[in-house]
């Protein structure tokens, strides 16, 4: 019952998490004091540490008490035992494969479409992923992150536009980035691959550094 106890304790602990919102004049930043997350955020992700530990996302290493929901043939949906939000899921691949976006981009789109009430996001292997050696996404309640609701305020003039598909710069909110607005999954894929190809890849890194957040409307 260890995994269940950890999960239950940490979800219960969310009730005591301290949250403070800062009004930045047109947008907000929300800070969260959540001590239980140190296990995840403080995880060692250097090559030696990854090699010496068992992968905690591989099915054979999951506690028998860990409930899992198969998603297609490639993924499992798990309750995150170290949650940030009341509804927080980790969605790893069943097969141990590195955290890279291109091989699982189509899965990213399908997951988001099937989990429409949620925001699905991806942290790159050097951009915050606590398991850079095992491909996974996360899903949280849509609207619980300020950017979900505020993003439309900060996209104005598009960089590129083809029919109803656009790339916007995201500026003025201390979270610079790019926003893809696409009418179809095929269009979203074409635009994303153009952006991906233009991003720099640092020496020794497997892909450009990135964090991705996706919603289906």
Where on the chain are the PLM-derived regions?
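Low-complexity, highly charged intrinsically disordered N-terminal segments
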Residues: 15-71
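Residues forming anionic-ligand binding surfaces in small-molecule and nucleic-acid pockets
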Residues: 79-95, 169-178
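Nucleotide/phosphate-binding site architecture used for ATP/NTP-dependent chemistry
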Residues: 49-76, 105-106, 162, 185-189, ...
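Short, small-residue-biased leader/transition segments that mark boundaries at the very start
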Residues: 2-5, 217
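Conserved His + Asp/Glu catalytic blocks
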Residues: 100, 111-131, 140-215
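Catalytic metal-binding acidic patch
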Residues: 93, 133-140
């Amino acid at each position: 019952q260890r995994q269940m106890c950890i999960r239950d304790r940490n979800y219960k602990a969310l009730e005591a998490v301290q949250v403070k919102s800062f009004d930045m004049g047109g947008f907000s930043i929300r800070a969260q004091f959540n001590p239980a997350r140190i296990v995840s955020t403080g995880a060692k992700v250097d090559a030696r540490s990854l090699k010496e530990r068992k992968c905690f996302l591989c099915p054979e290493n999951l506690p028998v008490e860990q409930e899992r929901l198969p998603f297609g043939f490639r993924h499992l949906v798990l309750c995150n035992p170290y949650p940030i939000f009341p509804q927080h899921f980790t969605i790893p691949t069943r097969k141990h494969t590195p955290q890279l976006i291109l091989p699982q981009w189509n899965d990213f789109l399908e997951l988001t479409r099937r989990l429409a009430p949620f925001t699905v996001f991806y942290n790159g292997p050097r951009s915050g992923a606590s398991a850079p050696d095992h491909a996974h996404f996360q899903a949280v309640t849509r609207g619980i992150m300020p950017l979900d609701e505020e993003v439309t305020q900060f996209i104005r003039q598009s960089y590129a536009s083809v029919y109803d598909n656009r790339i916007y710069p995201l500026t003025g909110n201390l979270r610079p980035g790019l926003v893809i607005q696409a009418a179809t999954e095929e269009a979203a894929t074409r635009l994303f691959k153009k952006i991906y190809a233009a991003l720099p890849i640092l020496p020794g890194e497997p892909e450009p550094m990135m964090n991705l957040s996706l919603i289906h409307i």
